[in-house]
Amino acid sequence: MALTKAELAENLFDKLGFSKRDAKETVEVFFEEIRKALESGEQVKLSGFGNFDLRDKNERPGRNPKTGEDIPITARRVVTFRPGQKLKARVENLKADQ
């Protein structure tokens, strides 16, 4: 199961006493700020969580799996996420506890 934006907003409502509307808006604004930073080419660093980076990928050869035809995969920019040490440690501890 995945954590959704709606569940994040519900947690803000339950744990911090935000109104449901304010909780939803807070979650939307948070993600919009991350989007804007990435769109303008900035790295996003969330201390204790991880970093969102932009990476340019070069054009490379590919193959159509149905026909076997060689086709070029165009150059593109992708978003990558590198978890921070604290997040890695917590996830590793979860595996050890289970």
Swiss-Prot record:
It comes from the Bacteria. This protein is one of the two subunits of integration host factor, a specific DNA-binding protein that functions in genetic recombination as well as in transcriptional and translational control. Residues 51-71 are annotated as: Disordered. One of its GO terms (cellular component) is cytosol. GO terms for molecular function: DNA binding; structural constituent of chromatin. The lineage of its organism: Bacteria, Pseudomonadati, Pseudomonadota, Gammaproteobacteria, Vibrionales. GO terms for biological process: DNA recombination; positive regulation of bioluminescence; regulation of DNA-templated transcription; regulation of translation. It comes from Vibrio campbellii (strain ATCC BAA-1116). Keywords: DNA recombination, DNA-binding, Transcription, Transcription regulation, Translation regulation. This is Integration host factor subunit alpha. The keyword RNA-binding does not apply. Belongs to the bacterial histone-like protein family. Residues 53-69 have a biased composition (Basic and acidic residues). SMART domains: BHL (SM00411). NCBIfam families: himA (TIGR00987), PRK00285.1 (NF001401). InterPro entries: Hist_DNA-bd, Histone-like_DNA-bd_CS, IHF-like_DNA-bd_dom_sf, IHF_alpha. Heterodimer of an alpha and a beta chain.
